[in-house]
Amino acid sequence: MVVVPEFLIRRIYQKGSLKKIVSGVSLTLKNVLGPGFISGFNFVKINDVVFEPKDVKFITNGQEYNGTEVSEVNPIAFRLGQVGTLIMSGKDCLVDGVNKIFIEALNPEAGKVHLVAEDTSKPD
């Protein structure tokens, strides 16, 4: 199993991208590490609010993936330089000031990958 240092994973999150949208909240990820795959979203936590895979969508290269559809059998190719928008629906989670972001995703080579970041939100 490949181990990816946390400081590298943190670079995937695009600082300043966290924003409230009509259906919930969105943020942007950019693969700055190298070609790879996302084989699942276990959960996304913003502040104290947890979004399960059913509440998560990932949009990249014009394709929309529901969090429950992404798996080891049905992974998302996430190439170097590729950008994706992660949308979490159904819950209000943003606060004024700094918001804490924790994403637990799966990668076929590295297993569970944790992305931890902080950001202030933009209005919709």
Segments predicted by a language model, with ranges:
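Terminal leader/tail segments of proteins
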Residues: 1-46, 50-124
